[in-house]
Amino acid sequence: MAQEQTKRTGGGDEDDTPGGDGAAGQERREKLAEDTDDLLDEIDDVLEENAEDFVRAYVQKGGQ
């Protein structure tokens, strides 16, 4: 399955405006969700076309 990684940065001037970035945060989450969905769709397409080769390559690289 897909995993989402989050990078947190230390404090700064941006923390001085409480609630000011709520809309920007929501927009960023929506963009990340859209990008993730696109990536998963691409993976699904590859697996539909060539699942056997994908599994064979995965096992050769040490996957279980």
UniProtKB/Swiss-Prot annotation:
Coiled-coil residue windows: 24-52
UniProt xrefs under Pfam families: Pup
Domain of life per record: Bacteria
UniProt-recorded Gene Ontology molecular function terms: proteasome binding; protein tag activity
Sites of Deamidated glutamine modification: 64
InterPro entries registered for this protein in UniProt: Ubiquitin-like_Pup
GO biological process, one term: proteasomal protein catabolic process
Keywords: Coiled coil, Isopeptide bond, Ubl conjugation pathway
Record note on modification: Is modified by deamidation of its C-terminal glutamine to glutamate by the deamidase Dop, a prerequisite to the subsequent pupylation process.
UniProt crosslink position (Isoglutamyl lysine isopeptide (Gln-Lys) (interchain with K-? in acceptor proteins)): 64
Annotated segments matching region Disordered: 1-38
Bias type Basic and acidic residues, positions: 1-11
Associated pathway: Protein degradation; proteasomal Pup-dependent pathway
Region ARC ATPase binding, annotated ranges: 21-58
Free-text comment on this protein's domains from its UniProt entry: The N-terminal unstructured half of Pup provides a signal required to initiate unfolding and degradation by the proteasome but is not needed for pupylation, while the C-terminal helical half of Pup interacts with ARC to target proteins to the proteasome.
Role summary: Protein modifier that is covalently attached to lysine residues of substrate proteins, thereby targeting them for proteasomal degradation. The tagging system is termed pupylation.
HAMAP family: Pup
Family, per entry: Belongs to the prokaryotic ubiquitin-like protein family.
Assembly, per entry: Strongly interacts with the proteasome-associated ATPase ARC through a hydrophobic interface; the interacting region of Pup lies in its C-terminal half. There is one Pup binding site per ARC hexamer ring.
Protein name: Prokaryotic ubiquitin-like protein Pup
Organism: Rhodococcus opacus (strain B4)
UniProt lineage: Bacteria, Bacillati, Actinomycetota, Actinomycetes, Mycobacteriales
Name of the coding gene: pup
